[in-house]
């Protein structure tokens, strides 16, 4: 035969409230401790259950003389629930208002991304440089040696474009972190705005492969290619 399951705290609270609602009377704690077992609530737990109801304003208590009396009426619980509902509705209205303000701010931030055009230009420049760099390497395979100074200039130009692109990437990550810290309740709306702006999950810093130096004597050819990029 399986062991009978004990009552949960919420079930005990409901049982003790029934005592008040059915009698609509005032009780001392020791009286409630005697009545509790009749509802399935052991006397040792009655005090804690009653205190939890008092903490939630579902049971009232008052000291009369040297005794403390407890009472609760169905109307008291109804008033308490209505009060909680009004507070929740007020909180919801406040949250909706704040959310609307947040959406407006995010829209303004999205419209204000014109500055990131510099990053777009830097990315375009970087792609062009990488392509020319690849073409240059293919052409220089024909030569035994290359001019280190010219290749160093090429590498520096690529590095400048690379740093510029990643600087704007860092600015975007900083802005995202700021929005997450200040508007955590609007995570989904922010992610939607990021996606619309082209900031997806694979958005990250640009990694630049190493640029090998060569020792070619064909400095004029390499320098001309660098000048063409400018």
From Swiss-Prot:
The keyword Metal-binding appears for this protein: no
Predominant place of localization: nucleus
Tissues/organs with expression: Expressed in reproductive tissues.
A matching Pfam family: LZ3wCH
Recorded coiled-coil stretches: 79-146
Segments traversing the membrane: none
Keywords recorded for this protein, A-Z: Coiled coil, DNA recombination, Meiosis, Nucleus
InterPro entries: LZ3wCH, Mnd1, Mnd1_HTH
GO molecular function, one term: double-stranded DNA binding
Entry's family note: Belongs to the MND1 family.
Protein name: Meiotic nuclear division protein 1 homolog
Species of provenance: Arabidopsis thaliana
Lineage: Eukaryota, Viridiplantae, Streptophyta, Embryophyta, Tracheophyta
């Amino acid at each position: 035969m399986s062991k009978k399951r004990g009552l949960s705290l919420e079930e005990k609270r409901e049982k003790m409230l029934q005592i008040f609602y059915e009698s609509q009377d005032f009780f001392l704690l020791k009286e409630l401790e005697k009545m509790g077992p009749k509802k399935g609530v052991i006397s040792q737990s009655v005090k804690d259950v009653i205190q939890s109801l008092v903490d939630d304003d579902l049971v009232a208590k008052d000291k009369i003389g040297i005794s403390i009396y407890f009472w609760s009426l169905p109307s008291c619980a109804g008033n308490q629930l209505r009060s909680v509902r009004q507070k929740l509705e007020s909180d919801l209205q406040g949250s909706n208002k704040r959310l609307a303000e947040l959406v407006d701010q995010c829209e303004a931030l999205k419209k204000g991304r014109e500055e990131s055009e510099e990053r777009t230009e830097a990315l375009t420049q970087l792609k062009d440089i990488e392509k020319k760099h690849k073409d240059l390497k293919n052409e220089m395979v024909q030569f035994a040696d290359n001019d280190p100074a010219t290749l160093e200039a090429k590498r520096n130009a690529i590095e400048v474009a690379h740093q510029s692109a990643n600087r704007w990437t860092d600015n975007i990550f900083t802005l995202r972190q700021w929005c997450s810290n200040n508007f955590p309740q609007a995570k989904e709306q922010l992610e939607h705005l990021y996606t619309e702006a082209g900031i997806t999950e694979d958005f990250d810093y640009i990694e630049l492969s190493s640029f090998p130096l060569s020792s070619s004597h064909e400095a004029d050819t390499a320098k001309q290619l660098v000048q063409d990029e400018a």
